[in-house]
């Protein structure tokens, strides 16, 4: 019973996340956090432009609340909106901007290189942008753009790298955009930290008793 409830809650959160992605495009929607409370369900929405989530006179947030109640059967939803501190370190925001630029006709290489520079300028330890699909011809291909340090496999890649997948609808077809970012605050298992300061030589003597 507990397992079924857990699965149902995760499915519900995934569906709500997909709904927000489509509804809050202009707001620069990133992700949500859902938490059950004694008085209902608190949903924290993280977005680049919180004002668009709230809407004029609270119209948008009311629409979201009504949909959560009626369609997704969320008990007494309380929506809280929080701004992103550094949008260029959020893979969902970066990926969305790349997809939007591609849909406007910008060249994929110029768009990707520009995004890489912004992410690294924001302080990331590393970034990888992968664009796949029909980019300039009939044949599909994959282009990768990377800078800095990046873990691609194993436990560090799962725990230290945040990623997002976005889609761009072009005339030639659907193009996938994957963004992976290693944030500046992560500590790598094999990272060596050198502390600055004066190095003092210490010599110790010990007496050896002779019997």
From Swiss-Prot:
Annotated keywords: Ribonucleoprotein, Ribosomal protein, RNA-binding, rRNA-binding
GO CC terms, sorted: cytosolic small ribosomal subunit
Superkingdom of source: Archaea
GO molecular function: rRNA binding; structural constituent of ribosome
The keyword rRNA-binding appears for this protein: yes
Keyword presence, Metal-binding: no
InterPro entries per the UniProt record, alphabetical: KH_dom (IPR004087), KH_dom-like_a/b (IPR015946), KH_dom_type_2 (IPR004044), KH_sf_prok-type (IPR009019), Ribosomal_S3_C_sf (IPR036419), Ribosomal_uS3_arc (IPR027488), Ribosomal_uS3_C (IPR001351), Ribosomal_uS3_euk/arc (IPR005703)
UniProt domain KH type-2: residue ranges: 16-85
BP GO annotations: translation
The protein's assembly and partners: Part of the 30S ribosomal subunit.
Entry function: Binds the lower part of the 30S subunit head.
Entry similarity comment: Belongs to the universal ribosomal protein uS3 family.
The name this protein goes by in its record: Small ribosomal subunit protein uS3
Taxonomic source organism: Methanococcus vannielii (strain ATCC 35089 / DSM 1224 / JCM 13029 / OCM 148 / SB)
Gene coding for it: rps3
């Amino acid at each position: 019973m507990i397992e079924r409830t857990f699965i149902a809650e995760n499915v519900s959160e995934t569906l709500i996340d997909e709904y927000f992605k489509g509804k809050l495009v202009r707001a620069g929607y990133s992700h949500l956090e859902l938490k059950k409370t004694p008085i209902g369900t608190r949903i924290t929405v993280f977005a680049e432009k919180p004002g668009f989530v709230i809407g004029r006179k609270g119209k948008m947030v009311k629409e979201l609340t009504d949909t959560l109640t009626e369609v997704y059967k969320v008990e007494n939803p309380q929506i809280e909106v929080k701004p992103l501190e550094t949008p260029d370190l959020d893979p969902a925001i970066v990926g969305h901007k790349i997809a939007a630029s591609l849909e406007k006709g910008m060249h994929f290489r110029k768009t990707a290189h520009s995004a890489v520079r912004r992410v690294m300028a924001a302080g990331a330890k590393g970034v990888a942008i992968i664009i796949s699909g029909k980019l300039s011809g009939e044949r599909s291909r994959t282009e990768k753009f990377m800078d800095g340090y990046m873990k691609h496999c194993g436990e560090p890649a799962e725990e230290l790298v945040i990623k997002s997948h976005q889609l761009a609808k072009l005339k030639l077809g659907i193009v996938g955009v994957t963004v992976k970012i290693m944030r500046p605050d992560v500590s790598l298992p094999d990272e060596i930290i050198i502390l600055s300061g004066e190095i003092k030589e210490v010599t110790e003597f010990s007496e050896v008793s002779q019997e």
